From Swiss-Prot:
Disordered as annotated region, ranges: 1-21
Keyword tRNA-binding in annotation: no
Similarity-based family: Belongs to the NSG family.
Annotated protein name in UniProt: Neuronal vesicle trafficking-associated protein 2
Length: 171
């Protein structure tokens, strides 16, 4: 405890009195330098990595981590291959999924074909199916060519119903 109203410089000059009620045990004891540090060894031995390797080979634990890493690598690669197969199958099924067609149509060769045309061409010879697709492709090409011939700036009705100028009889 610290005594109130006392000057620290007077502490050493005035002998402590019993009336103060404080014990006379010093708070700080002097330290000796010999107790602070351990004596330094005269010879220091530094063990290197090469000294530890023969010990590890003798223990037999050196092979265990390699086998564990190898099996983990195999398991991870098998899991990735399995996931790749699943993704491939999902994508394959998405592209080859049987698409629904409106009523009266049949899905053949990635197209919706009217059922009556499919029945008609299936009763014909086997080459008729290729002729059917040829007719469809020519129809779409012809449809595009007539639209281009008119011109995008003119309407189709204006070209068809355009009044012709009267012919004048020449001299």
């Amino acid at each position: 405890m610290v005594k109130l109203n006392s000057n620290p410089s007077e502490k050493g000059t005035k002998p402590p009195s019993v009336e103060d009620g404080f014990q006379t045990v010093p708070l700080i004891t002097p330290l000796e330098v010999n107790h602070l540090q351990l004596p330094a060894p005269e010879k220091v031995i530094v063990k290197t990595r090469t000294e530890y390797q023969p010990e590890q080979k003798n223990k037999g634990k050196f092979r265990v981590p390699k086998i564990a890493e190898f099996t983990v690598t195999i398991l991870v690669s098998l899991a990735l291959a399995f996931l790749a197969c699943i993704v491939f199958l999902v994508v394959y099924k998405a592209f080859t999924y049987d698409h629904s067609c409106p009523e009266g149509f049949v899905y053949k060769h990635k197209r919706c074909i009217p059922a009556s045309l499919d029945a008609y061409y299936s009763s014909q010879d086997p080459n008729s199916r290729s002729r059917f697709y040829t007719v469809i492709s020519h129809y779409s090409v012809a449809k595009q060519s007539t639209a281009r011939a008119i011109g995008p700036w003119l309407s189709a009705a204006a070209v068809i119903h355009e009044p012709k100028p009267p012919k004048t009889q020449g001299h």
